[in-house]
């Protein structure tokens, strides 16, 4: 059984809007020239990657549920951003370790989602 919380249509729309804003923020911060984007010190570049994709995946799961197209799309987004960074030449470099951090954030969100669903089902 797949966990999907019972949300009102309005709550789903807000979740979808938050997902879209997070997606746009990730695209901007990932593809803008390196000197044009702020980089808060959260413990390193890989932590920022994992955190960004954790939040994006969590919002996507909230708004749309655990659909394969959502999870596959986020995976492709992470890979596509790294490829684009390697090709753009704007002071950014594509990095396989960044992709692993992106996927780690996505996997952590999915695991937490499943654990939450099991906990809710046990109640």
Predicted regions and their residues:
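Membrane-embedded catalytic cores of phosphoryl/pyrophosphoryl-handling enzymes
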Residues: 61-64, 68-85
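Membrane-helix interface segments
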Residues: 13-14, 65-71, 95-96
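Hydrophobic faces of alpha-helical transmembrane segments in multi-pass integral membrane proteins
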Residues: 56, 73-80, 100, 104-108
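Short, charged juxtamembrane terminal tails flanking transmembrane helices
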Residues: 1, 118-123
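"…centered on the first transmembrane helix and the immediately adjacent amphipathic helix/loop
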Residues: 1-58, 74
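Membrane-interfacial alpha-helical segments at the cytosolic side of multi-pass membrane proteins
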Residues: 51-68, 104-116
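Interfacial helix-loop-helix junctions of multi-pass membrane proteins
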Residues: 36-45, 81-104
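Short helix-capping/hinge motifs at transmembrane helix termini and TM-loop junctions
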Residues: 32-33, 65, 89, 117
């Amino acid at each position: 059984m797949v966990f999907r919380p019972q949300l009102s249509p309005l709550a789903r729309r807000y979740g979808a809007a938050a997902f879209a804003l997070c997606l746009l923020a990730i695209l901007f911060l990932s593809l803008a020239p390196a000197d044009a984007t702020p980089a808060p010190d959260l413990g390193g570049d890989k932590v920022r990657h994992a955190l960004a994709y954790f939040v994006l995946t969590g919002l996507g799961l909230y708004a749309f549920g655990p659909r394969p197209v959502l999870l596959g799309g986020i995976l492709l987004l992470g890979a596509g951003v790294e490829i684009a960074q390697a090709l753009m030449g704007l002071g950014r470099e594509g990095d396989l370790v960044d992709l692993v951090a992106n996927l780690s954030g996505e996997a952590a969100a999915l695991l937490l989602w499943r654990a939450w669903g099991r906990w809710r089902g046990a109640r």
